[in-house]
Amino acid sequence: MQARISFIASLGFLALSLIGVQTAFATEAASNCGIPSDAHDGWAISSPEEQALNSTLLCTMGDGISEGKLANVDDIVVVRHGVLVYERYYPQKQLHTDATTLHRGYSMTKSVVSLLVGIAVDRGWINDLDVPIVSYFPENADLRMPDKAPITLRHLLTMSAKLGSSETPGVSFAYSNGETELVGAVLQKATGKTVDVLAQENLFAPLGITDVEWLKDPFSGIAQSARGLILRPRDWAKIGQLVLNRGVWEGKQIVPASWVVKSTAEQIKTEGPRSAEHIKAEGPDSYGYQWWLGRSLDKDRRVEWIAAMGFNSQKTIIIPALDMVVVFNASRQSKNMVAPELDLLDRYILPAARN
């Protein structure tokens, strides 16, 4: 009888020990989930808690994505207070992704081109955004159209040039890849360099971005200004942090602060007049110089953000009020979801930063 009691007690002790181990493991897993490794690429690293972020919410989000319950994303990178705090990758069946994987940004490229225009203005390569762009192409004077002569670089930057339309430039927004390609052509005329070379010398090198690809136009062989840039997710985050810092990286002014402020401020509405009820809605509703501006709602808190956006839910989101940058990359769309990455932002990332 005594031996039986001793055996039962031993089983109880073993069970309690296992529960303790499992609890400790779960706690450790939650605290370590998504914490980046130091790649010696210019990023300081810490846990989410050290930067006042709730790691449990971030891990819940990450696990939901891994289990196929949430949006289809390839990676999420979160930076707060200039420190990389969360980084998680989700390999797909035919696509391996990790911290070294280059990811095409599609139209996020446009926002990088805007930074190049700011650098060109600062260096005196471009003197005036309101000069008609035909002045950059005197060799094509015979192709000028009287109704399009007033188009300026400012019109192109705000997607209001109305190329291929009889509408007056500068009045309303109409998204166009062609307008950003023209911005790239103006940059090449003004600087003598294509956007990829200009970016490497004046933007990527100072940021310590070394692994870069840039898709070329199949006919001209020139780098695509509208949607050709391919970077690591961590490097897309550097672009976001540069903007959050008003053009400064590691104490050096790379892009003029005045340009960053102006280019990420509302220059034109992307929608018509909004009702009082509509104003409460989430998502992008205005445009700067190749940057989107929008908002999210975290319970009663309205959070304004700036974003570079690309096809298939590519987003680099800058949240000044929370001193935070969030990068999403994806290679396939999420079913029945219009903006899956914004859903993740609203349900998990913003609440994680609530305190």
Where in this protein do the model-derived segments appear?
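N-terminal leader/targeting segments and the immediately adjacent pre-domain N-terminus
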Residues: I5-F7, F13-T97, I119-N127, T158, ...
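Active-site-proximal alpha-helical segments within enzyme catalytic domains
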Residues: E179-V186, L229-W249, Q314-A330
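Active-site helix/loop module of the DD-peptidase/beta-lactamase fold
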Residues: R104, R123-L163, K193-R227, L231, ...
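Active-site Gly/Thr loop motif
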Residues: D211, T264-V325
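Active-site SXXK
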Residues: C59, G82, Y89-Y90, T101-L129, ...
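Structured C-terminal helix/loop/strand segments within mature extracytoplasmic catalytic/sensor domains
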Residues: T27-A30, A308-N355
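Short, small/polar residue-rich loop motifs at catalytic or cofactor-binding pockets
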Residues: L70-V73, T101, F311-S313
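Structural helix-adjacent loops and short alpha-helical linkers that scaffold large soluble proteins
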Residues: N54, G124-L129, L187-Q200, G247-P256
